[in-house]
Amino acid sequence: MKVYINVYDLMPDSPVNKLAWTLGLGIYHTGLVLEGKEYAFGAHEIPGSTGVFATMPRPPLEGCRWRCSIALPNCTLPKPDVDRILIRLSQEFTGLSYSLLERNCNHFTNAAAIELTGSPIPSFLNRISRIGLAFPTITNALLQHGQKNTSDVDDSSDSSSDVDEETLIVSKSKKAHKDIPKFSAPPPSADLNNLITDSLP
């Protein structure tokens, strides 16, 4: 079976974005394509439910644009084994377990790629999360600055409720850096209409 990754750019098209792409420092969403379906991972607030969903390849995604496709080695596993792997991964990657820095769509794509092809995704696709974890104080300062600028533009949001928000620097990172303030942001959403269950769509 042919396997490839669709890469989507989360940064607006600009000279800075072009430089980030050249340096491998962009912010990307990825999905793994297998047998005409694209499998990806996103966040939602349904307890015990997967965040893995399947769509047609290159679906329209709000806030990002398709950048390229990257071929992986072929998957030589029998179809029942492929289905079992995808179902198991969908149980491990729940919507509530999503973390922008420690468990994002690229982590799922990498796990699926390794299990199905024996090959990881290119490291630049998730480099920004590794940088964010290595420098959590700087990451939070930058993100809080961005959040402040966003709230200056739209002050209609109710800051007292963070039910739909998610902490960017999670507890494991905070243990090493206790002075990091909490910063919350809405995580990317899973396609709730196409979640993987005990059988593949």
Swiss-Prot record:
Pfam family, one: Peptidase_C97
GO molecular function list: deubiquitinase activity
Active site: 29, 105
Chief localization: cytoplasm
Residue ranges of domain PPPDE in the record: 1-143
Compartments reported by the entry: Cytoplasm
PROSITE patterns hit by this protein: PPPDE (PS51858)
Residue spans of biased composition, Polar residues class: 191-201
EC number: 3.4.-.-
Superkingdom per UniProt: Eukaryota
Keywords on record: Cytoplasm, Hydrolase, Meiosis, Protease
Renumbered residue ranges of the record's region Disordered: 146-201
InterPro entries per record: PPPDE_dom, PPPDE_sf
Acidic residues bias: start-end ranges: 152-167
GO cellular component terms given for this protein: cytosol
An annotated GO BP: proteolysis
UniProt function note: Has a role in meiosis.
Entry similarity comment: Belongs to the DeSI family.
UniProt cross-references to PANTHER family, sorted A to Z: DESUMOYLATING ISOPEPTIDASE, IP06716P-RELATED
Record protein name field: DeSI-like protein sdu1
Origin organism lineage: Eukaryota, Fungi, Dikarya, Ascomycota, Taphrinomycotina
